[in-house]
């Protein structure tokens, strides 16, 4: 109120705290709405010369969907069909598969190899190329990739939130003039924003200045994905609880995501470190964008729609979820359609819900619900229904400036994947 407006020179501790809280409220949520692509796609190899390849913000044409064999096998030739026998051989293979214009090849080779070793995953050309393709798509092999127009996006989001929460402009302007821990004012730092790592650091500095802010405001950090593979920070935090991190214990998992080594490790884990029945790598690319098992679940939704006659969103989410990740009480459209088939499936409501709760695991494929639904779908349509389907999701975020979908993303990465396999053939 009036006290805040009078605070132009020396502020009391309480007034400073209120100013900072006002600033945190307006910054929280900026650019973090939607966890998908945070920058325009890096150009494909055939769209740019070598000298231009380091400009990931350039607009790129969508390639035609690449041809794939029925089982998604890599092209025949000199690529090793079995894992390489040693880390030394793996490094040689990774260097061979990286695009020619990648800078710091040795560092990228080392971090990719160490991630596979730490995750105890066999290093085949197909798996290595999957990781290389995602890195190329998400960051153009920049460990801290720039987001074109990030400062402008943040200012727009700040203004929207200022109006939403009724914060007087004079109060916000005063808060922005405060000197931050790095010696610059918060206004100057926002004007200079170029990367998500910088945005993350700004928010962390803000929250650290509010008494108890690190604990109180941690869940409101607007940056939810980051690093060269744009991996989810929530996923990274869960990963270190399940498996030992291969490097020295970091000050924070969040900060480690923004490093090359951490971003590569967590990204490869998200992409490849889970069992799936997919015959083609493109469905892992779709899952990387939409969530694990989304391609399998979208196919399940398609089969369910055929049997029930209901029009369903093929988004790969079978249930509704709360912010904490637990299933919501409100039934999803997929759940309602499934319940409408109780008698035909010979399953009760409790059994159906029990099976649907396994949608984020491989075990879902062995449930009575999954097996009986597909038996119905196959017999009803007279053909074997697909068991995997790229989810149909429109990607939305303040950072996205043109229509993008999960299908676009998956085909884009698949094209890079095929290019990588061809490099191994040459």
Per-range role (PLM):
Residues 18-28:
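Bacterial N-terminal signal peptides
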């Amino acid at each position: 109120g009036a006290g805040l407006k009078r605070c132009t020179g020396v502020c009391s501790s309480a007034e400073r705290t209120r100013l900072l809280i006002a600033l945190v409220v307006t910054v929280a949520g900026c650019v973090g709405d939607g966890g998908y692509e945070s920058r325009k796609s890096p150009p494909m190899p055939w769209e740019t010369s070598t000298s231009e390849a380091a400009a990931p913000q350039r607009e790129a044409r969508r390639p035609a969907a690449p041809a794939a064999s029925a089982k998604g096998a890599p092209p025949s030739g000199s690529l090793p069909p079995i894992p390489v026998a040693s880390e030394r051989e793996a490094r040689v293979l990774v260097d061979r598969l990286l695009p020619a214009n990648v800078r710091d090849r040795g560092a990228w080779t080392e971090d990719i190899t160490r991630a596979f070793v730490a995750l105890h995953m066999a290093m085949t050309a197909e798996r290595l190329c999957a990781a290389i393709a995602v890195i190329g798509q998400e960051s153009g092999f920049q460990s801290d990739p720039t987001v074109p127009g990030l400062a402008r996006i943040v200012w727009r989001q700040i203004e929207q939130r200022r109006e939403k929460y009724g914060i007087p402009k004079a109060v916000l302007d005063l808060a922005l003039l405060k000197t931050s821990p790095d010696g610059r004012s918060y206004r100057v730092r926002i004007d200079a924003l170029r990367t998500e790592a910088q945005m993350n650091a700004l928010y962390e500095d803000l929250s650290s200045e509010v008494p108890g802010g690190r604990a109180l405001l941690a869940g409101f950090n607007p940056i939810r994905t980051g690093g060269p593979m744009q991996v989810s920070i929530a996923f990274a935090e869960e990963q270190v609880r399940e498996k030992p991190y291969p490097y020295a214990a970091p000050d924070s998992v969040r900060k480690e995501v923004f490093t090359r080594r951490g971003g590569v490790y967590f990204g490869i884990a998200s992409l490849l470190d889970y069992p799936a029945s997919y015959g083609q790598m493109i469905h892992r690319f779709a899952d990387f964008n939409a969530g694990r098992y989304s391609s399998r679940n979208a196919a399940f939704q398609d089969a369910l729609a055929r049997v029930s006659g209901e029009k369903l969103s093929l988004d790969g989410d079978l249930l509704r979820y709360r912010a904490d990740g637990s299933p919501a009480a409100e039934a999803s459209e997929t759940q309602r359609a499934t319940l409408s088939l109780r008698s035909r499936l010979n399953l009760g409501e409790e059994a159906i819900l029990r099976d649907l709760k396994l949608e984020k695991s491989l075990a879902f494929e062995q449930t009575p619900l999954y097996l009986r639904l597909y038996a119905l779908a196959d017999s009803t349509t007279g053909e074997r229904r697909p068991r995997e389907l790229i989810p149909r999701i429109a990607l939305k975020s303040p950072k996205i400036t043109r229509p993008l979908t999960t299908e676009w993303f998956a085909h884009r990465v698949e094209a890079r994947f095929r290019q990588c396999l061809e490099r191994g053939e040459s």
